[in-house]
Amino acid sequence: MINVRNLRLNYGASEILNIPRLDIDVSKITALTGSNGSGKSTLMRVMSFLQKPTSGEVRLWGSSAPSLNLLRDVSVLLPEPALLKRSVRENFKAVLKSRGVLGEFDERASEALNLVGLDESFLNKRHFELSSGQTQRVSFALNLALRSRLYLLDEPTNSVDVGTSKLFGKAVLYMRQRYGCGFVIASHDDKWLSAVAEENVFLHKGRVCEFEYKNIFDARDGVLKFDENTVVNLPSNLRSATKIAVNPGKITLSKTPIDGCLSGILHSVSLYLGKELLVKIKVGDFLIKTLAPNSQNFSVGENIYFKFDEEAFLGLE
């Protein structure tokens, strides 16, 4: 487990992180999501013990001061990884030697390169011969070759195309199944991340939030207006709010009209965290994101009815 308690991190007068409590099951694949500046990368550095917080503590497998041997069970991939200024082969030798498994070079290097879609001819390439996308692939492969107990991946799909992103996703799932590896992954690629993750932690302005802010709308005079026929009156305590987040998990969906419902066109359906459906409803010029059980059947383009629960709304501004 990773256990975060009373964590605060400030840069001067600016508060970057403020997390009273967070528990992450590191045997699973956990998504760390949030907009730019939400604190994802900073939290990843703190959880990997690369950066000290201003106050509070992080415990990794019960230890707030993990030994070097314990930290060897963790692999960290940063957004802009740098290779040693040597051949790819020498990079693999260096990382495998650091973990005492250099004798398994052939097996581990071959498997890792294959997982990221590269053949063994890349072992002979020098670092300067690689494109940014190839550098990202090799860096990820170096981490995979370690078969670590836990991976902390910060924007792993940076600089790679859609096809390579899919390979990375398959690699994560393979390592989880084959070696029991756990992952905490921060990424702006929500679609890619939701396809591989089992759990989600959402950050907003350095704080862990109850739900992911997929629905953010402007409000005026206590009203959300999606089109001329779709108007939602907000609870009295939010009448002065100008920006509202709507919890996707607190929207009821129906294929037939229900009391007090609104209607729209079903825009798209995709799997979310492997256990729910992310259903997008088009209403006027807006897309409303909702979550539904994976057992429900929907057809894109059909009329869909929905109703906001009373506790669905959160005032942001």
Where are these regions (language model features)?
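Conserved ABC ATPase "signature" region
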Residues: 104-122
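Non-catalytic connector elements of ABC transporters
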Residues: 225-317
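Conserved catalytic motifs of ABC-family nucleotide-binding domains
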Residues: 80-90
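Conserved ABC ATPase signature
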Residues: 126-130
